[in-house]
Structure formats: structure tokens, C-alpha cells
A protein has these predicted regions:
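N-terminal presequence-like segments and the immediate start of the first folded domain
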Residues: 10-13, 26-91, 95-108, 114-169
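Low-acidity, Ser/Thr- and Arg-rich intrinsically disordered low-complexity segments
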Residues: 1-7, 11, 16-17, 24
Length: 169
């Protein structure tokens, strides 16, 4: 048995950006992992939530958005047009990611909620604009949701991993 994985070993093995296993003490033995940092929350003007929820949070190189809608930031309103909502949603996603230092290239997973099945086609049109390389698109899961407020018919959230080794901070 590899001693790094022994049950009495209180270390955490972390994979570094160079692909090397890095042994860090576990908090159970009083150690502090130097690769971890505290969570940072970011709000984005025009894309705030009514509840005390940030637009995006980041710990180290991991980024997670809250719900991203198709709000038009110039008016603060959701467009009635489905295509406009989808386009604004992806534009807002780009802006929100940027607030935490991420880009669309850093995104590894997107979850999309749609009110009706035919909205998927509009999401797909904007999806290939945001992620044009078919060999480098994030995973995506699309689900139906019928409790949107007002004229909202689409919303997403995303997870991203920033490549710190490449100088993205």
C-alpha cells in the first residue's frame, strides 16, 4: 500500500498545476494548507441579487457563479425576447466571470435552466458563440424549470478553474 494513502496519514494530497502531487498537512493535525485561501465574493453592478448573494465567489483558482440571468444591465430589466435573454445571459456570464478573474476559457461546467424545451435552440446558438471550439467546450447540463419570476425564461450558473500557472490570477 502506498504510504501516502495510509489511513493514519493526516495529509491531503493536492495536485499542483504542474501535475505533481503536493503533500499538505490536514487541519486535523493543526497544519494549514498553504495552497488554500479564504473565499472571496464579488458583486457586479447591474447584476446583483435581491438576496444577500454575491454574483460570483472564488477560493484559490476555483470560481463559482450564482444564478446568471439575461438582465439588460443598461435598463435593469429582463428582455421579453427569448433570443435577447439568451444573448444577455452569456454576456452577463462573461462579465461575472471577469469580476473574479476568470474567462470563458476557464469554465469547466455550466448548468442552464430553461422554461420551455424550444428555448434550448436559442441557448445553443449563444453557446457556440461563447464556446466556439467544439474540442474545448465545458460540460453542460440543461434542465427545465417552471418557476421563473416575471418574463425570465432562462438562467445559468458556471464553475471555472483558473490556470494560475499560466499567469491568470
Amino acid at each position: 500500500m502506498n504510504s501516502a494513502f495510509a489511513s493514519n496519514d493526516l495529509s491531503i494530497l493536492m495536485l499542483s498545476s504542474a501535475g505533481q502531487l503536493d503533500r499538505r498537512p490536514d487541519s486535523r493535525d493543526g497544519g494549514i494548507s498553504t495552497n488554500m485561501s479564504k473565499r472571496k465574493s464579488f458583486d457586479v453592478e447591474g447584476l446583483g441579487h435581491a438576496n444577500p448573494i454575491p454574483a460570483v465567489s472564488r477560493i484559490g483558482n476555483i470560481v463559482a457563479t450564482g444564478g446568471v440571468s439575461g438582465t439588460d444591465t443598461s435598463t435593469g430589466k429582463i428582455p421579453d425576447d427569448v433570443a435577447a435573454q439568451c444573448a444577455r445571459m452569456f454576456a452577463n456570464l462573461r462579465t461575472i466571470l471577469g469580476a473574479a478573474g476568470a474567462t470563458p476559457e476557464d469554465v469547466i461546467r455550466v448548468t442552464v435552466w430553461i422554461a420551455r424545451p424550444e428555448i434550448r435552440a436559442e441557448v445553443n446558438k449563444e453557446w457556440v458563440v461563447m464556446f466556439p471550439d467544439p474540442h474545448s467546450r465545458p460540460a453542460r447540463h440543461t434542465m427545465f424549470y417552471d418557476h421563473f419570476a416575471g418574463s425570465m425564461v432562462v438562467q445559468c450558473e458556471a464553475w471555472a478553474v483558473i490556470d494560475i500557472a499560466a499567469g491568470h490570477v
